[in-house]
Amino acid sequence: MAYITKRGNSYSVRYTYEDEHGKSCDKWESFPTKEEATNRKKQIEHELAAGTFLIPSSVTVAEFLMDWLPKQCSKHKWAPKTYESNLSTIQNLIIPYIGSMEMQKLKPYHMENLYTTLSKTPCGSYIEGKKQELTEKQKQRFLSGTTIHEVHRLLGTAFQYAVEWGILAKSPVPVDSPKKSTQERTIWTVEEMRAALDSMEDPILHLAVHLTLVGALREGEIVGLTPEDIDFDAADGIGTFCINKSMQRVRKEALNQVDDGCIIKVFPDKLERSTTSLILKSTKTASSCRTIFMTSALKEELKKWLNQLAADEMKDPTRYHDSGMLFRLPNGLAVEPVLIRKKFLKWQDAHPEFPRIVFHGLRHSSATYQLMISGGDVKAVQGTTGHATADMLVNTYAHIQQSSRVELGRKFEEGFYAKQESPSPQAVPAAGEPTISMTALLELLKNADPEVKAQLRLALLT
């Protein structure tokens, strides 16, 4: 039962409820008019009778998210990078803007305002929750739609738990999510890949790039290889290497929160009071574990590299620190992913004739080339790239190089507009005349440029 009391110029609604521990609590809510107080009284009595009453809570967005995050990490056995990424999103993209707001006062328009604010926010405005001083150039680079979409996704998941936990009656996160960025990936042609590899003189960089181009590897997978992953005699002497581990540098805070079941090894810190750790972990999904077939050139390079590792150890065994990894420095310590990226950036600075791409772009370049030479055999390429599903592979590499589009257009024109000697649908083309089967035509149309599809529709209707 709820009661209305006039207190000065306002009206108060007093009611009693049981908290989450079953304890009886009194609550007062003030309203400027009697009408508002009456409406609230009716609402409270209805919810108490129906068992849908929401226990008043002053918990803030920041308090809730920092309580929710480790619980989800433990429940879903997140990898360190997953925890670190979500923590960064909360600390840098959510708490600075709505962290002090009470959960029960959040409305959908607060979420929309957050998305609008983030769309006008420069990248790196906050790091570990601390406001950063940006240069004028840095202020011109804004958060992407994909980043804002990730904020929406995280809040949608978190606030749904808030509903289940009885903190919110319903989630304030809008149904419509911010649109992801659709910027086309920059990749290299096969000629550029070959020329770039030939120009790389640094042995560590050369081998890393060679492995990436053959196997479409991720950076962490490259430096996560061990000599035991290599089998020169497998596949009737072709040779293979297995991808089943990944190397990452993660914050110690994340390492302390995650389930250590996926952690294979934690490398010793190089610096005292380091806030991060270098780890070797199992690959992120079952599909990421895969076997890659060597090329003869890669096979020879790997043999020479292993011989060099043995020679390095023999030079000074007492000072050699055998990390057990395939990629090692001359002193035996493991090569980190960041070193590969730095070496690649240095090489790019010295070779401006090549299109500028990030190191991960080599993986995209390799996967795209393999899709081309396989005739679009998605399942075969998926086995190499380690994508979880064929759809993910197709969606990731939906782009096609300009040369392929020109060739596709040429084949379409030759096949579609080919003249037949007889109007019969069973007519046999003259010798040397371009032909195209219905199956091939359908395959071409499925991958055709939108303009070509539009031309076909027009031709069919006229």
Could you describe each region identified by the protein language model?
Residues 232-235, 245-289, 298, 410-462:
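C-terminal secondary-structure termini that scaffold catalytic or DNA-interacting sites
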Residues 3, 17, 70-161, 182, ...:
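N-terminal core-binding DNA-recognition domain of tyrosine site-specific recombinases/integrases
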Residues 123-127, 198, 202-203, 215, ...:
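Short, basic (Lys/Arg/His-rich) helix/loop patches that form interaction surfaces
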Residues 179-180, 187, 245-249, 385-411:
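Catalytic-site neighborhood detector that most strongly recognizes the C-terminal catalytic loop/helix
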Residues 7-112, 128, 310-322, 402, ...:
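N-terminal DNA-binding module of tyrosine recombinases/phage integrases
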Residues 127-145, 149-151, 164, 168-227, ...:
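Basic, Lys/Arg- and aromatic-enriched nucleic-acid-binding interface segment
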Residues 1-32, 240, 244-274:
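Short, Arg/Lys-rich segments that mark the N-terminal edge of DNA/RNA- and chromatin-recognition modules
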Residues 229-237, 375-398:
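Short, polar N-cap/turn motifs at the start of nucleic acid-interacting alpha helices
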